[in-house]
Amino acid sequence: FSYFDEHYDNLPEVICLLKGNMIGRHCSREFFEQVYDNKTFTFLYDEKQYWDRFSKYNENKEKNEIGTTFLAMENVYVEKNNSWYVDSPNHPKKYFNDVDDLLRFIYKDPMIPQYCMFSPGACFIVRREQISKHSREFYRNLNKIMNYAMDPSFPSEAHQIERILPIIFTSLCEVNDWMDDEAAFEAKLPECSAYIQYKWENRPRRFKKLRKMLGLI
């Protein structure tokens, strides 16, 4: 979001949000060449090799079982909102346990979705008015949520924000006041770390009574 911050007053009408490895990993060159000149909000994602698994019917015309992931259309990936990735040791979390907590921190009264509709890799074509619906401070604060460390890799919060980008760019929900105020945000964010620690210390554990008796906890 640094580009949004640095060029907030003179953003181009349409922006492509890309990754260096997008072509070949998240979409084909053929797909990108067909859509790169779009002037509307576009998911830059296209993996036809998964159509057979994620569509309603497979190549044998048999109905697929509904799983935790599927395609809403050819370039819109949908994933059950279970934040399965947050316990990865390669992407540790500091502020938010899951997408639900993140949405509640950003918005005053968010609708918590059962599924997240997003573009894997966070690659989109987005319009200026979608970006400017939020303040410059809003994007600075989002950066603080997901760019605080690379130990050993980017944090879990980056995965979480990847999944809510369509919400950020399209939702009409009102954001919390601290999202538009850097000082208030920096005063509020440590509460999230304390909450993470509390939930970890009070997480359900097997054989808790036995462990306590043995002096292990």
Task: Indicate residue ranges for each PLM-predicted region.
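ER/Golgi luminal nucleotide-sugar-dependent glycosyltransferases, focusing on the catalytic module
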Residues: 1-217
